[in-house]
């Protein structure tokens, strides 16, 4: 109930209480407030006990689904699905674990390995005399339709 109240707020209330109520009556007021809280807690506990004794079996029937809902709300999504659909047998969902799937060899990986092996088989060896064949470079300037990079159609 008072989980959001910090020590700073409590200190501020005590200082305001000292100013408004006065230092003579403040300790007595604190004792009265404490006694009222304890009396309220005792009354609530007594009411719970009397309801449990009068309607215990009916409350148990209501509590079962509520506790089950509370259990599901505390679970992770994977655990809740496993419990509801597979009777706590998580081996079915473990088959879809991405880490396990990626650790195993896949068809795509096998295809890439095959291509790499084929590419390594097609490697051309260099001549032993040290001469290297230079690749021909296709330069657009060498083409018959080279016009210098500007066309009249670009301007008009």
UniProtKB/Swiss-Prot annotation:
The keyword Transmembrane belongs to this UniProt entry's keyword annotation = yes
Is Transmembrane helix tagged as a keyword? yes
Q: Which residues form a coiled coil?
A: none
Please report the record's description of how this protein sits within the membrane. Answer: Single-pass membrane protein
Kindly list the GO CC terms recorded for this protein.
TAT protein transport complex
The family database entries (InterPro entries) matched by this protein are listed as: TatB
Q: Where is the composition biased (Polar residues)?
A: 113-122
List all disulphide bridges recorded for this chain. Answer: none
Q: Where in the cell is it found?
A: Cell membrane
Residues in the signal sequence: none
- What parts of the sequence cross the membrane? 2-22
Which keywords does UniProt give here? Cell membrane, Membrane, Protein transport, Translocation, Transmembrane, Transmembrane helix, Transport
Q: Where is this region: Disordered?
A: 100-156
Q: Which family does it belong to?
A: Belongs to the TatB family.
Its job: Part of the twin-arginine translocation (Tat) system that transports large folded proteins containing a characteristic twin-arginine motif in their signal peptide across membranes. Together with TatC, TatB is part of a receptor directly interacting with Tat signal peptides. TatB may form an oligomeric binding site that transiently accommodates folded Tat precursor proteins before their translocation.
Give the record's subunit note: The Tat system comprises two distinct complexes: a TatABC complex, containing multiple copies of TatA, TatB and TatC subunits, and a separate TatA complex, containing only TatA subunits. Substrates initially bind to the TatABC complex, which probably triggers association of the separate TatA complex to form the active translocon.
What name does the UniProt record give this protein?
Answer: Sec-independent protein translocase protein TatB
Species: Corynebacterium glutamicum (strain ATCC 13032 / DSM 20300 / JCM 1318 / BCRC 11384 / CCUG 27702 / LMG 3730 / NBRC 12168 / NCIMB 10025 / NRRL B-2784 / 534)
């Amino acid at each position: 109930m008072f989980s959001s109240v910090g020590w700073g707020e409590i200190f501020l209330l005590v200082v305001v209480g000292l100013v408004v109520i006065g230092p003579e009556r403040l300790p007595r007021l604190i004792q009265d407030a404490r006694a009222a809280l304890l009396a309220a807690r005792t009354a609530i506990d007594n009411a719970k006990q009397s309801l449990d004794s009068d309607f215990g079996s009916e409350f148990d029937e209501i509590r079962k689904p509520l506790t089950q809902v509370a259990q599901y709300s505390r679970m992770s999504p994977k655990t809740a699905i496993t419990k509801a659909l597979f009777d706590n047998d998580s081996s079915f969902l473990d088959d879809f674990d991405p880490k396990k799937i990626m650790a195993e060899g896949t068809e795509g990986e096998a295809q890439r390995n095959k291509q790499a092996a084929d590419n390594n088989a097609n490697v051309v060896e260099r001549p032993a005399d040290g001469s290297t064949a230079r690749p021909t470079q296709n330069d657009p300037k060498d083409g018959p339709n080279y016009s210098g990079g500007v066309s009249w159609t670009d301007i008009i």
